């Protein structure tokens, strides 16, 4: 996907990482990716870099619900998300692994947020970032919103859902973000 760090060729990524590490104030690398962008070359690069500096990989899962993933046009499945996390953890044991989730998809329920926490608990994840699904101007979602086909979660409902998620999340998983 365009705008995903790992969309570039691995050789280009490695070059960019090397340039970043030349700066004395850079203390590590945070790499954003998607489940469908994890290749053996990516794993090799992460493992190599993690031997030299702190490396965190942030995986944009967004949801474990297949219908919501299709609606979001993510192009990957929940099973691919789980597999990618497990691959990174196994191939790159020194890498700090985080996941991003978005709350507010159509027909999403509180029970789905609790289920997401349980699924994350079963994975080798170190941190999580939560996002509220919002409407951006000039997007297909903006058109759905304008036609009354999509309504974002109210702020209070979103934070209640976050609280439910957090109540079920393993206490050793750091929460890096509650809203974006």
Residue ranges and their predicted role:
Residues 121, 127, 134-180:
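Auxiliary Fe-S-binding modules of radical SAM enzymes
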Residues 1-10, 23-39, 53-81, 126-131:
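Core AdoMet radical
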Residues 9-18, 39-50, 113:
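Distinct, well-ordered alpha-helical segments
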Residues 23-26, 87-97, 123, 161-173:
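A structural motif corresponding to the C-terminal end of an alpha-helix
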């Amino acid at each position: 996907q365009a705008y995903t760090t790992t969309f570039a060729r691995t050789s280009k990524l490695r070059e960019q990482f090397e340039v970043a590490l030349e700066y004395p104030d850079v203390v590590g690398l945070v790499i954003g990716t998607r489940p469908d962008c994890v290749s053996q070359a990516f794993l090799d690069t992460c493992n190599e870099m993690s031997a030299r500096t702190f490396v965190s990989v942030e995986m944009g899962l967004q949801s474990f619900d297949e219908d919501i993933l299709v609606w979001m046009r993510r192009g990957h499945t929940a099973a691919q998300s789980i597999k990618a996390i497990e691959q990174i953890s196994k191939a790159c044991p020194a890498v700090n692994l985080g996941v991003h989730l978005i709350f507010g998809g159509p027909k999403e329920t509180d029970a789905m947020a609790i289920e997401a926490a349980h699924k994350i608990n079963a994975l080798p994840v170190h941190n999580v970032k939560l996002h509220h699904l919002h409407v951006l101007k000039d997007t297909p979602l903006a058109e759905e919103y304008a036609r009354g086909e999509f309504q974002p979660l109210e702020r209070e409902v979103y934070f209640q859902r976050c609280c439910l998620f957090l109540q079920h999340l393993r206490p050793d998983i750091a929460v890096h973000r509650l809203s974006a």
